[in-house]
Amino acid sequence: MSGSNPKAATAGSQAGPGGLVAGKEEKKKAGGGVLNRLKARRQGPPHTPDDGSGAAVTEQELLALDTIRPEHVLRLNRVTENYLCKPEDNVYSIDFTRFKIRDLETGTVLFEIAKPCISDQDQDAEEESVDVDISVGRFVRYQFTPAFLRLRTVGATVEFTVGDRPVTGFRMIERHYFRERLLKTFDFDFGFCIPSSRNTCEHIYEFPQLSEDVIRLMIENPYETRSDSFYFVDNKLVMHNKADYAYNGGQ
């Protein structure tokens, strides 16, 4: 869920039909678009290796590779401290512009953010001589109430655009940790995105059941719950976003 520059999911394109070919459940959007909903195709059980494809690897080992692939990040056993790719590796100009989290049982919107348009950002930077931080958009910090930890199913809806190149095999692997403990792995396929398209998507997150002791510790230790979101095109890492979480809101 690391998206302030958002994170998420699956959908139709405003540039024409088939902007994303991946949806399993479809629902008409206002305005005639199509919102596709995806559940994770693979969700590794908590506290265990995800795919049995090999021994655990370290962040340093992955940083030494020329190409990082999905099977590599699935073998990480802790959250990363650094980004595993550079912003310029996103040669497809994938840009997340809006992000919303909602409780699927009640429909309550829990979090929503939109990215300012580029022209506004450029004008503000020119007027105020603001230095550009290349990490902006790669990290987001969330604060939720304790009740969030008792939710079972959450929908994360995102809008994103792609540049003038087709995007094939677009996939996100998101791994959530509390301290050194892997809580859950989510693995979503976006599918194919046509060039110069704007897409709207929703990922369905089915959260693990946590013990009361773990819930208490997560509430008492804000921002020690962290996640990595890895984005792949044709099985090559092109984007890496991070997030951390507090669950003591309203206290």
Curated annotation (Swiss-Prot):
<keyword id="KW-0969">Cilium</keyword>
<dbReference type="InterPro" id="IPR014756">
    <property type="entry name" value="Ig_E-set"/>
</dbReference>
<comment type="similarity">
    <text>Belongs to the PDE6D/unc-119 family.</text>
</comment>
<dbReference type="InterPro" id="IPR037036">
    <property type="entry name" value="PDED_dom_sf"/>
</dbReference>
<protein>
    <recommendedName>
        <fullName>Protein unc-119 homolog B</fullName>
    </recommendedName>
</protein>
<dbReference type="GO" id="GO:0060271">
    <property type="term" value="P:cilium assembly"/>
</dbReference>
<feature type="binding site">
    <location>
        <position position="142"/>
    </location>
    <ligand>
        <name>tetradecanoate</name>
    </ligand>
</feature>
<dbReference type="GO" id="GO:0035869">
    <property type="term" value="C:ciliary transition zone"/>
</dbReference>
<keyword id="KW-0970">Cilium biogenesis/degradation</keyword>
<feature type="region of interest" description="Disordered">
    <location>
        <begin position="1"/>
        <end position="56"/>
    </location>
</feature>
<comment type="subunit">
    <text>Found in a complex with ARL3, RP2 and UNC119B; RP2 induces hydrolysis of GTP ARL3 in the complex, leading to the release of UNC119B. Interacts with NPHP3 (when myristoylated). Interacts with CYS1 (when myristoylated). Interacts with MACIR; interaction only takes place when UNC119B is not liganded with myristoylated proteins.</text>
</comment>
<dbReference type="GO" id="GO:0042953">
    <property type="term" value="P:lipoprotein transport"/>
</dbReference>
<feature type="compositionally biased region" description="Polar residues">
    <location>
        <begin position="1"/>
        <end position="13"/>
    </location>
</feature>
<keyword id="KW-0813">Transport</keyword>
<dbReference type="GO" id="GO:0008289">
    <property type="term" value="F:lipid binding"/>
</dbReference>
<keyword id="KW-0007">Acetylation</keyword>
<dbReference type="InterPro" id="IPR008015">
    <property type="entry name" value="PDED_dom"/>
</dbReference>
<keyword id="KW-0446">Lipid-binding</keyword>
<keyword id="KW-0653">Protein transport</keyword>
<feature type="modified residue" description="N6-acetyllysine">
    <location>
        <position position="24"/>
    </location>
</feature>
<comment type="function">
    <text>Myristoyl-binding protein that acts as a cargo adapter: specifically binds the myristoyl moiety of a subset of N-terminally myristoylated proteins and is required for their localization. Binds myristoylated NPHP3 and plays a key role in localization of NPHP3 to the primary cilium membrane. Does not bind all myristoylated proteins. Probably plays a role in trafficking proteins in photoreceptor cells.</text>
</comment>
<keyword id="KW-0966">Cell projection</keyword>
<dbReference type="InterPro" id="IPR051519">
    <property type="entry name" value="PDE6D_unc-119_myristoyl-bd"/>
</dbReference>
<feature type="modified residue" description="N-acetylserine">
    <location>
        <position position="2"/>
    </location>
</feature>
<dbReference type="Pfam" id="PF05351">
    <property type="entry name" value="GMP_PDE_delta"/>
</dbReference>
